[in-house]
Protein backbone atom coordinates (compact mmCIF):
# COMPACT_ATOMS: atom_id res chain seq x y z
CA UNK A 1 0.00 0.00 0.00
CA UNK A 2 1.20 3.51 -0.85
CA UNK A 3 -0.25 6.59 0.87
CA UNK A 4 0.25 10.02 -0.74
CA UNK A 5 0.00 13.00 1.63
CA UNK A 6 -0.62 15.94 -0.68
CA UNK A 7 0.06 19.65 -0.33
CA UNK A 8 -1.94 22.41 -1.99
CA UNK A 9 -1.75 21.97 -5.75
CA UNK A 10 -1.00 25.13 -7.70
CA UNK A 11 -0.69 25.71 -11.40
CA UNK A 12 -3.14 25.18 -14.19
CA UNK A 13 -1.20 23.50 -16.96
CA UNK A 14 0.49 20.24 -17.76
CA UNK A 15 1.94 19.55 -21.21
CA UNK A 16 -1.30 17.75 -22.03
CA UNK A 17 -3.65 20.54 -20.90
CA UNK A 18 -1.68 23.16 -22.81
CA UNK A 19 -2.83 21.52 -26.05
CA UNK A 20 -6.47 22.53 -25.60
CA UNK A 21 -7.85 25.29 -23.35
CA UNK A 22 -10.88 23.15 -22.47
CA UNK A 23 -8.58 20.84 -20.50
CA UNK A 24 -7.45 23.58 -18.09
CA UNK A 25 -7.28 22.65 -14.42
CA UNK A 26 -9.87 24.03 -11.98
CA UNK A 27 -9.07 27.42 -10.49
CA UNK A 28 -11.08 27.72 -7.28
CA UNK A 29 -10.58 31.13 -5.68
CA UNK A 30 -13.44 31.50 -3.21
CA UNK A 31 -12.66 32.31 0.42
CA UNK A 32 -14.27 29.20 1.84
CA UNK A 33 -13.13 26.39 -0.45
CA UNK A 34 -10.59 27.83 -2.87
CA UNK A 35 -6.87 27.52 -2.23
CA UNK A 36 -5.11 30.46 -0.64
CA UNK A 37 -2.77 30.95 -3.60
CA UNK A 38 -5.58 31.02 -6.17
CA UNK A 39 -7.54 33.42 -3.97
CA UNK A 40 -4.56 35.77 -3.71
CA UNK A 41 -3.97 35.67 -7.46
CA UNK A 42 -7.60 36.34 -8.29
CA UNK A 43 -7.75 39.14 -5.75
CA UNK A 44 -4.68 40.70 -7.37
CA UNK A 45 -6.20 40.32 -10.84
CA UNK A 46 -9.30 42.33 -9.90
CA UNK A 47 -7.64 44.88 -7.60
CA UNK A 48 -9.07 43.39 -4.39
CA UNK A 49 -6.70 43.51 -1.40
CA UNK A 50 -5.11 40.14 -0.66
CA UNK A 51 -6.81 38.90 2.51
CA UNK A 52 -4.50 37.31 5.05
CA UNK A 53 -6.49 35.64 7.84
CA UNK A 54 -5.26 36.44 11.33
CA UNK A 55 -1.49 36.84 11.48
CA UNK A 56 -0.92 34.78 8.33
CA UNK A 57 1.42 32.57 10.33
CA UNK A 58 -0.25 29.36 9.18
CA UNK A 59 2.22 27.30 7.16
CA UNK A 60 1.01 25.41 4.12
CA UNK A 61 2.69 22.92 1.77
CA UNK A 62 2.54 23.49 -2.00
CA UNK A 63 3.16 21.45 -5.13
CA UNK A 64 2.85 22.39 -8.81
CA UNK A 65 0.37 20.31 -10.80
CA UNK A 66 3.17 18.98 -13.05
CA UNK A 67 5.09 17.81 -9.99
CA UNK A 68 1.94 16.22 -8.56
CA UNK A 69 1.53 14.18 -11.74
CA UNK A 70 5.22 13.20 -11.60
CA UNK A 71 4.87 12.16 -7.93
CA UNK A 72 1.96 9.85 -8.74
CA UNK A 73 4.05 8.32 -11.53
CA UNK A 74 7.03 7.86 -9.19
CA UNK A 75 4.81 6.26 -6.53
CA UNK A 76 3.30 3.86 -9.08
CA UNK A 77 6.75 2.90 -10.38
CA UNK A 78 8.14 2.34 -6.86
CA UNK A 79 5.58 0.31 -4.90
CA UNK A 80 6.50 -1.29 -1.60
CA UNK A 81 7.41 -4.96 -1.75
CA UNK A 82 4.69 -7.44 -0.87
CA UNK A 83 4.41 -7.69 2.89
CA UNK A 84 6.24 -4.39 3.53
CA UNK A 85 4.76 -1.64 5.65
CA UNK A 86 2.66 1.11 4.09
CA UNK A 87 4.86 3.47 2.09
CA UNK A 88 4.05 7.11 2.85
CA UNK A 89 5.08 9.85 0.43
CA UNK A 90 4.76 13.56 1.16
CA UNK A 91 3.60 15.01 -2.12
CA UNK A 92 4.84 18.61 -1.78
CA UNK A 93 7.79 20.67 -2.95
CA UNK A 94 7.90 23.64 -0.57
CA UNK A 95 6.21 25.26 2.41
CA UNK A 96 5.29 28.90 3.01
CA UNK A 97 3.59 30.88 5.72
CA UNK A 98 0.43 32.49 4.36
CA UNK A 99 1.73 36.03 5.00
CA UNK A 100 4.97 35.23 3.12
CA UNK A 101 2.91 33.90 0.23
CA UNK A 102 0.87 37.13 0.28
CA UNK A 103 4.09 39.17 0.18
CA UNK A 104 5.32 37.14 -2.81
CA UNK A 105 2.06 37.61 -4.74
CA UNK A 106 1.90 41.30 -3.76
CA UNK A 107 5.46 41.80 -4.99
CA UNK A 108 4.76 40.09 -8.33
CA UNK A 109 1.40 41.78 -8.90
CA UNK A 110 1.88 45.19 -7.30
CA UNK A 111 -1.11 44.58 -5.00
CA UNK A 112 -1.49 45.38 -1.31
CA UNK A 113 -2.48 42.84 1.32
CA UNK A 114 -4.58 43.24 4.46
CA UNK A 115 -4.70 41.30 7.71
CA UNK A 116 -8.35 40.39 8.42
CA UNK A 117 -10.04 38.43 11.20
CA UNK A 118 -9.54 34.70 10.86
CA UNK A 119 -12.94 33.05 10.25
CA UNK A 120 -11.42 29.67 11.13
CA UNK A 121 -10.59 28.33 14.55
CA UNK A 122 -6.92 27.52 14.05
CA UNK A 123 -3.58 28.44 15.56
CA UNK A 124 -2.35 31.90 14.60
CA UNK A 125 1.12 30.50 13.94
CA UNK A 126 2.20 26.98 13.11
CA UNK A 127 5.21 25.26 11.69
CA UNK A 128 4.76 22.51 9.15
CA UNK A 129 7.61 20.03 9.34
CA UNK A 130 7.37 17.83 6.28
CA UNK A 131 9.92 16.22 3.99
CA UNK A 132 9.74 14.99 0.43
CA UNK A 133 13.19 13.36 0.47
CA UNK A 134 11.80 10.08 -0.85
CA UNK A 135 10.43 11.72 -4.00
CA UNK A 136 13.63 13.73 -4.44
CA UNK A 137 15.74 10.58 -4.14
CA UNK A 138 13.56 8.92 -6.81
CA UNK A 139 14.06 11.70 -9.35
CA UNK A 140 11.57 14.49 -8.63
CA UNK A 141 12.91 17.84 -9.82
CA UNK A 142 10.58 20.28 -8.04
CA UNK A 143 9.03 23.38 -9.53
CA UNK A 144 9.11 26.24 -7.02
CA UNK A 145 6.70 29.16 -6.80
CA UNK A 146 9.46 31.73 -7.22
CA UNK A 147 10.80 30.13 -10.42
CA UNK A 148 8.51 32.03 -12.75
CA UNK A 149 5.74 29.51 -13.18
CA UNK A 150 3.75 31.53 -10.68
CA UNK A 151 3.32 33.87 -13.65
CA UNK A 152 1.35 31.04 -15.32
CA UNK A 153 -1.39 31.14 -12.72
CA UNK A 154 -1.32 34.93 -12.45
CA UNK A 155 -1.97 35.07 -16.20
CA UNK A 156 -4.92 32.67 -15.83
CA UNK A 157 -6.37 34.83 -13.05
CA UNK A 158 -6.07 37.95 -15.21
CA UNK A 159 -7.52 36.20 -18.26
CA UNK A 160 -10.68 35.18 -16.41
CA UNK A 161 -10.97 38.18 -14.06
CA UNK A 162 -14.16 39.31 -15.80
CA UNK A 163 -15.87 36.12 -14.58
CA UNK A 164 -15.11 36.70 -10.91
CA UNK A 165 -17.93 36.80 -8.39
CA UNK A 166 -16.48 39.32 -5.89
CA UNK A 167 -18.95 38.10 -3.27
CA UNK A 168 -17.27 34.68 -3.25
CA UNK A 169 -13.80 36.01 -2.42
CA UNK A 170 -14.13 36.67 1.32
CA UNK A 171 -14.34 33.75 3.71
CA UNK A 172 -17.87 34.03 5.07
CA UNK A 173 -18.39 30.62 6.69
CA UNK A 174 -17.51 30.93 10.36
CA UNK A 175 -16.17 28.01 12.32
CA UNK A 176 -17.60 29.29 15.62
CA UNK A 177 -19.88 32.11 16.73
CA UNK A 178 -16.78 33.86 18.12
CA UNK A 179 -15.18 34.21 14.68
CA UNK A 180 -15.60 37.11 12.22
CA UNK A 181 -15.81 37.11 8.43
CA UNK A 182 -12.49 37.52 6.62
CA UNK A 183 -13.41 40.74 4.82
CA UNK A 184 -11.00 43.69 4.49
CA UNK A 185 -12.34 47.13 5.45
CA UNK A 186 -11.64 48.65 2.02
CA UNK A 187 -12.99 45.81 -0.16
Where are the model-predicted features located?
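Conserved beta-loop-beta element that borders a ligand/cofactor-binding pocket
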Residues: 1-27, 51
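Short glycine-rich loop/turn motifs that provide flexible caps or phosphate-binding loops at active sites
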Residues: 6, 10, 33, 46, ...
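Short, flexible micro-motifs
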Residues: 10, 14, 37, 57-59
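Short-chain dehydrogenase/reductase
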Residues: 27-38, 61-62
Amino acid sequence: ITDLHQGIIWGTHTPQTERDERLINRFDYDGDYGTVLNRFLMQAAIGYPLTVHGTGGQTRAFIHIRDMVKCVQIALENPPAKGDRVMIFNQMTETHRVRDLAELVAQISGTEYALVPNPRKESAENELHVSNDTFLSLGLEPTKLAEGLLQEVEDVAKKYADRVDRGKIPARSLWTSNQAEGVPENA
